[in-house]
Amino acid sequence: MSLSTEAKAQIIAEFGRDVNDSGSSEVQIALLTAQINHLQGHFSEHKKDHHSRRGLLRMVSQRRKLLDYLKRKNVTSYTALIGRLGLRR
């Protein structure tokens, strides 16, 4: 249920500071968002997959923590990122 290598590389190229930047907060948040969106489709078919739902909740929590960190450190980057990702905030 993870993203393909090509999809990850595309996200890193789009949100990272350079091609090898996979650790910045913006890239991590974008990768988690893509993975969360991918799992949303999975749950429309598999409603009783509670094991994966726990993983989804863990990803959402991790994204929330990273968004809070980014908001504390760099508000302009935070607002730009949530606008680009289309998150409700």
UniProtKB/Swiss-Prot annotation:
Instruction: Cite the entry's keywords alphabetically.
Output: Ribonucleoprotein, Ribosomal protein, RNA-binding, rRNA-binding
Protein name as catalogued: Small ribosomal subunit protein uS15
Q: How does it assemble?
A: Part of the 30S ribosomal subunit. Forms a bridge to the 50S subunit in the 70S ribosome, contacting the 23S rRNA.
Q: Summarize the protein's role.
A: One of the primary rRNA binding proteins, it binds directly to 16S rRNA where it helps nucleate assembly of the platform of the 30S subunit by binding and bridging several RNA helices of the 16S rRNA. Forms an intersubunit bridge (bridge B4) with the 23S rRNA of the 50S subunit in the ribosome.
Which family does the entry's similarity section mention? Answer: Belongs to the universal ribosomal protein uS15 family.
SMART domains associated with the record: Ribosomal_S15 (SM01387)
For this protein, the record's CDD domains field holds: Ribosomal_S15p_S13e
Q: Cross-referenced PROSITE patterns, in alphabetical order?
A: RIBOSOMAL_S15
List the InterPro entries.
Ribosomal_uS15, Ribosomal_uS15_bac-type, uS15_NS1_RNA-bd_sf
GO biological process, alphabetically ordered: translation
Q: Which GO terms describe its molecular function?
A: rRNA binding; structural constituent of ribosome
Question: Mind telling me which NCBIfam families this protein's record contains?
Answer: S15_bact (TIGR00952)
Tell me which positions the record assigns to the signal sequence: none
* Pfam families (alphabetical): Ribosomal_S15 (PF00312)
One GO cellular component this record assigns the protein to is: cytosolic small ribosomal subunit
